[in-house]
Amino acid sequence: MKILLIDDHKLFSQSIKMILELSENIKKVQLVDNFSTISEIAFNDYDIILIDINLTSLYQADGLTLAQEIIDNGCSSKVVILTGYSKKMYEHRAKAMGAYGFLDKSMNPDELVKKLEK
């Protein structure tokens, strides 16, 4: 499985990458902290795109807006929202737009890997 992680917090991203790469089922984890067009993301060959809701320094809008644009551009990857914010506040919007999942950043690392491997 190939995963793209879009998050503007480098320390968090690097930690998650190290955890995910310990899984036998995850072959590649690519970190994105800079991009200029949606097509750079949407049309690469990833199984899952993990997107943080708060992308202040990366993108002109929030992660949900970026996720919606990726989905609307016909990306075949599963888009999963990753957040440290209240689930109730954003989960309904994420599901309504077609996101595959919604995960909490404070989740146990083993649980995160299990959910992504489903």
Label each PLM-derived region with a short phrase:
Residues 61, 86-103:
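Alpha4 helix (beta4-alpha4-beta5 surface) of REC/receiver domains from two-component response regulators
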Residues 52-54:
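Active-site residues of response regulator receiver
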Residues 89, 107-116:
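C-terminal output helix
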